Design a protein with these regions (language model features):
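Membrane-embedded alpha-helical bundles that constitute the cytochrome b-like, heme-associated redox core
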Residues: 1-218
Length: 218
């Protein structure tokens, strides 16, 4: 039985969640930036009007949190740090040259992707908590003004960190050829998998061999 030239990298449900977050994050980030910079008030037109932007901003933020928590449950076991992350970090120069397969036996996600995962998840949690504290007219009146001021500062700082993290994530997705295709179509070439995630590719091969063996016994 000949092997397919491609393998499944990302299931449909995960791709749907990813692109839902992408769209919502764009709307939330754009509207959030406009709140802090009056000269960029026109950015709120993504929601129709400035008033609608202020109303919908937190609701879209909550939607992002819910979807990301669903993704957290699905991906956390792949993002636990392991000993293979150490040589990857130490060999970052070779990694940037495209030779990561020479420095570490990378699983489904490399050390950089794991750091990105935990950064995004931690920042979205902080943004939710601080966002609830400053959310008018529903929750802000339950907190003293000093708490709201600190929450605003932390919320803005976390948002800046998250926006930069997402920009890095986007750059790396374009930089590593084949990555975006995996998130759009859900599949990557065997060569891509073997080069960038050799340990994960071996696991996929083992599962394929086991499946073929089971089917052959029927």
């Amino acid at each position: 039985m000949s092997k397919s030239k491609t393998i499944v990298r990302t299931k449909f449900v995960d791709r749907a969640c990813h692109w839902t977050v992408v769209i919502c994050f764009f709307l939330v980030a754009v509207s959030g930036i406009s709140f802090f910079f009056p000269t960029l008030q026109w950015l709120t037109e993504t929601f129709g009007t400035p008033q609608m932007g202020r109303i919908l901003h937190p609701f879209f933020g909550v939607l992002i949190f819910v979807v990301l928590m669903f993704m957290f449950v699905r991906f956390v076991h792949h993002n636990i740090p392991d000993k293979q992350d150490i040589p990857w970090v130490k060999g970052i120069v070779e990694v940037l040259k495209g030779n990561e397969h020479k420095v570490a036996k990378v699983g489904k996600y490399n050390a950089g992707q794991k750091m990105m995962f935990w950064t995004i998840m931690s920042m979205i949690f902080v943004l939710l908590v601080t966002g609830v504290i400053i959310w008018r007219p529903y929750f802000a009146h339950y907190f003293p003004i000093q708490v709201i001021r600190y929450a605003l500062l932390i919320h803005a700082t976390s948002a800046i960190i998250l926006i930069h993290a997402i920009l890095i994530h986007m750059y790396m997705a374009f930089w590593v050829k084949g990555s975006i295709k995996g998130m759009i179509e859900g599949k990557v070439s065997r060569r891509w998998a073997q080069k960038h995630h050799p340990r994960w590719y071996r696991d996929v091969e083992r599962l394929e061999a086991k499946k073929e063996s089971t089917e052959g016994m029927k």
